[in-house]
Amino acid sequence: MKTIISAKDVHLSYGDYEALHGINLNFKEKELTALIGPSGCGKSTFLRCLNRMNDDIENIKITGEIKFEGQDIYGSKMDLVALRKNVGMVFQQPTPFPFSVYDNVAYGLKIAGVKDKELIDQRVEESLKQAAIWKETKDNLNRNAQAFSGGQQQRICIARALAIRPKVVLLDEPTSALDPISSSEIEETLMDLKHQYTFIMVTHNLQQAGRVSDQTAFLMNGDLVEAGPTEEMFIAPKKQITSDYLNGRFG
């Protein structure tokens, strides 16, 4: 698998506080990479660097290099709209817009200037099917998306992210606010989709990381401690601190 996103010596500071210390990490195309580590270790901060979601935070400074398909995303030639079209995001709390399921999923297409109603209809249906929420919504496309359960709302958000056909989807603890059944359904969806898209997922749930990810990266206090194939890391981590974390000795 080729590398689709690469991070080289990435440092991030909020004023005088340095949250990330020289992260070097490559993400392979059409795999799911889990970012794990204790609360406050920099997982979500790093994730948000990958499509520049940190840009509007006051007093933030980012150095180093992050490339998407070989292009420096912090370079002057980077089109931010194009970047976020290709690198979508799903947040911890379900965030459907306060309008219909159809309009939620079609939103990105319309913003991108797609006017072909037939194409939009087709893409909405395809995306809802990909996110495993079509059966629950096909007869309720005009219903307010916020009227659905939390797990259903999160799958609608995944469908919304997929509708513009991104190459990468960033997931910031996408199941942490959901019940176990809804979490399991989201995991099944990711397993079905991870050979079509590249997923990078922050999770506190080590069992979840073990179940769904191909690669895992362990962060601690803003440092990348270890990264590699999930099965190898979970069975035979190279660092003692990784073993301690995976075995619940802290975190």
Curated annotation (Swiss-Prot):
One GO location term (cellular component): plasma membrane
Superkingdom as given in the UniProt entry: Bacteria
Protein location: Cell membrane
Limits of the ABC transporter domain: 5-246
Keyword Cell membrane: yes
A Pfam family matched in the record: ABC_tran
Role: Part of the ABC transporter complex PstSACB involved in phosphate import. Responsible for energy coupling to the transport system.
The protein's name in its UniProt record: Phosphate import ATP-binding protein PstB 2
Gene this chain is encoded by: pstB2
